[in-house]
């Protein structure tokens, strides 16, 4: 999509309700543990933020196991390009700091990008590093603890530095430029049906789409997938400014799209208007 994030289900917030009860669409979707003497579980007891309650717990009894993410049908790299990797990490009581090797591996098993971070904090902390792509390749992400132990992880992100206008948490340079080349007079966002949702609890709440990424409240949408809200109102307004288009934000009127409310609940709610001066 337009949002440049390369890791799928980075926040471990996928839920079966996103896709009409599909049990495979859950907090571990797109993640896979490979190797023996290791466990990968999901916890909610003390999250980074209440709006982002699920996080991963990786326990290694013998070095060698890797936690992988396939991205969105792969992670396409461009030769020589740099990619920002980040995550929230924490060491639980009873365990020591641990080095986490971060690799991007192609279908032949060749390492196309590599870096490492050392998770050492007892409380949630952001860790960052940069990977450089050796060649143009279709890859997947591998995370490997270098020592026996346990770490807790959340908001695992991989972003190309080459986003549209170089914006952090930005848009894909190619797709955004294609839109810019049309020279639109205005941009309507986030949409129509997606704004109304299918009931009061699923209305697009713009205030949940701004601020720190870990504090944004994700949601399902009518199209049967998950919205991380990484691309939120701030990013839409920023894009409009970057291409010289008039922003046309959409606020739900409180009536579900095409009478699609759950259990016949057609009651809606009003959102506070956005001060355009801000």
PLM feature spans:
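Extracellular and organelle-lumenal recognition/adhesion modules and their flexible linkers in secreted
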Residues: 1-229, 241, 246-250, 261-274
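Conserved radical SAM core fold
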Residues: 254-256
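Generic structural signal for well-ordered alpha-helices
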Residues: 175-176, 233-237, 278
């Amino acid at each position: 999509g337009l949002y440049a994030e390369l890791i799928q289900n980075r926040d471990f917030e996928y839920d079966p309700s996103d896709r009409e009860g599909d049990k495979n669409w859950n907090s571990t979707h797109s993640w896979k543990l490979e190797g023996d003497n290791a466990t990968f579980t999901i916890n909610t007891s003390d999250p980074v933020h209440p709006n982002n309650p699920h996080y991963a717990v990786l326990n290694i009894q013998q070095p060698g196991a890797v936690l992988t993410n396939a991205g969105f049908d792969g992670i396409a790299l461009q030769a020589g390009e740099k990619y920002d990797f980040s995550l929230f990490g924490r060491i639980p009581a009873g365990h020591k700091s641990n080095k986490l090797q971060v690799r991007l591996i192609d279908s032949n098993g060749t390492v196309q990008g590599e870096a490492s971070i050392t998770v050492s904090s007892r409380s949630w902390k952001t860790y960052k590093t940069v990977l450089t792509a050796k060649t143009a390749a279709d890859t997947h992400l591998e995370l490997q603890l270098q020592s026996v132990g346990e770490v807790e992880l959340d908001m695992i992100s991989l972003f190309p530095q080459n986003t549209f206008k170089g914006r952090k948490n930005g848009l894909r340079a190619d797709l955004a430029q294609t839109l810019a080349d049309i020279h639109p007079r205005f941009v309507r966002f986030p949409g129509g049906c997606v704004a109304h949702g299918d009931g009061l609890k699923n209305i697009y709440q713009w205030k949940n789409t701004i601020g720190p990424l870990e504090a944004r409240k994700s949601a399902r949408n009518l199209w049967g997938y998950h919205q991380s809200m990484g691309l939120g109102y701030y990013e839409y307004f920023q894009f409009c400014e970057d291409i010289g288009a008039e922003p046309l934000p959409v606020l739900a009127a409180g009536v579900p799209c095409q009478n699609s409310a759950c259990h016949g609940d057609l009651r809606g709610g009003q959102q506070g208007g956005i001060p355009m001066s801000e």
